[in-house]
Design a protein with these regions (language model features):
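Mature extracytoplasmic or otherwise solvent-exposed domains
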Residues: 2-376
């Protein structure tokens, strides 16, 4: 059990490319660029505020554990945990032993049994501590959840709901865009308490319509109050000149390459617990019509507990699945001006750990194949 609140690291980065839709369209480019920059500035300030609140939640979490366990018992647990790790769970050397892995597994299992005895001797039950851990893990996940869009209008719909003209590829009255797209944007921000910095891969490619990301968080020496909060945005965009003013009707054809989670968990002590959430979203923004970004959850996973070196994983969306997303803007776009339509992904990867080692991988990868637009 280590005090890892002091081992907090954060990173923020972003970029975008916005070529003009036509010669002399400087006003539109500057306007959309300003919107993108202001949205990022606002999200950074919001993240800064949430990190302070997260630190307060972790402090309260620690206080409640101390009140439940008592200072003397907590010191015993600390010493036991430290001695077990230093001695490699009582096994000095494994590198030249062909049975080393099996011996280590047995030694760790024995250490867990002894840790439960420590709790019982202190008149404590593992379930009591786990209830505390899960309550505070939920508080952190709620804190890290983004604000809901002011008007949530983006929907994931079956092909049967798609207009016949779109499915048949008719260009009247629709304007259709396929890769390569005009612009692109990406951003990520993460904070961790313990473990390694997350390994990140972007799938963004405006030439092919590829969006999404891969993130991996490894923490093989999880302390009392470890965790990760990661957000990753990618998008491609197109300029649109409407035939007249009015709300924009948008249909998006997207092909899912990977909507997959993989979470390895390894219990360390009888009081251990963990929760890992992964959420993938498709997003749409129409500048300047929509102030914030609309999104529809495409998949999610929640993995929890303290198993004995177990990996949980699944393709939540079958690879190569084609899904349709639909949005009609609540506000009209003006006539005689360019609007910028941005389509992509917003992913959130959160882990909260208490003495559970983990290797958690999120993959959310899509191809935006078609964007259909018409003005009502």
């Amino acid at each position: 059990m280590a005090n890892t609140i002091q081992n907090n690291r954060s990173s923020v980065d972003f970029g975008f490319h916005l070529p003009p839709p036509a010669d002399g369209a400087n006003k539109e480019v500057l306007s959309v660029s300003q919107i993108l920059l202001e949205r990022k500035r606002s999200s950074i300030m919001e993240r800064k505020d949430k990190i302070v609140k997260a630190e307060n939640i972790i402090t309260d979490w620690r206080k409640e554990v101390i009140e439940k366990v008592g200072e003397t018992n907590l010191k015993k647990f600390h010493e036991y945990s430290k001695n077990q790790r230093r001695s490699n769970f009582g096994i000095k050397e494994l590198s030249h032993d062909p049975d080393g892995l099996a011996k280590l597994t047995l030694a760790k299992r024995k250490a867990r049994e002894n840790s439960i005895d420590l709790l019982k001797n202190a008149k404590l039950e593992p379930g009591g501590l786990k209830n505390i851990h899960r309550r505070y893990a939920k508080k952190l996940d709620d804190l890290f959840s983004p604000k809901e869009p002011k008007t949530s209008r983006l929907e994931m719909l079956p092909e049967s709901k798609v207009p016949k003209g779109v499915l048949e590829g008719k260009s009247n009255p629709w304007t259709t865009r396929r890769p390569p797209f005009d612009g692109w944007a990406w951003s990520y921000s993460w904070s961790r308490w313990g473990g390694h910095d997350p390994d990140l891969v972007s799938y963004l490619n405006a030439a092919t319509g590829s969006v999404g990301h891969r993130s991996e968080y490894q923490n093989y020496d999880a302390g009392d109050f470890d965790g990760l909060w990661l957000e990753y945005d990618t998008s491609v965009g197109v300029w649109y000149w409407p035939p007249h003013a009015g709300p924009v009707d948008i249909w998006i054809k997207a092909r899912c390459v990977k909507g997959r989670y993989s979470v390895w968990l390894d219990d360390e002590w009888g009081w251990s617990d963990s929760s890992t959430w992964m959420r993938g979203n498709i997003t749409v923004n129409v500048s300047p019509s929509i102030v914030d970004e609309d999104r529809a959850e495409s998949w999610w996973s929640h993995t929890w507990g303290n198993p004995d070196s177990t990996t949980y994983g699944s393709d939540v969306i079958a690879p190569n699945s084609v899904l349709w997303f639909h949005l009609v803007t609540s506000d009209p776009i003006p006539a005689g001006a360019w609007s910028y339509i941005k389509v992509g992904t917003y992913d959130r990867h959160t882990s909260v750990l208490n003495d559970v080692s983990t290797d958690a991988i999120m993959r959310d990868w899509w191809y935006i194949e078609e964007i259909w637009m018409d003005v009502h």
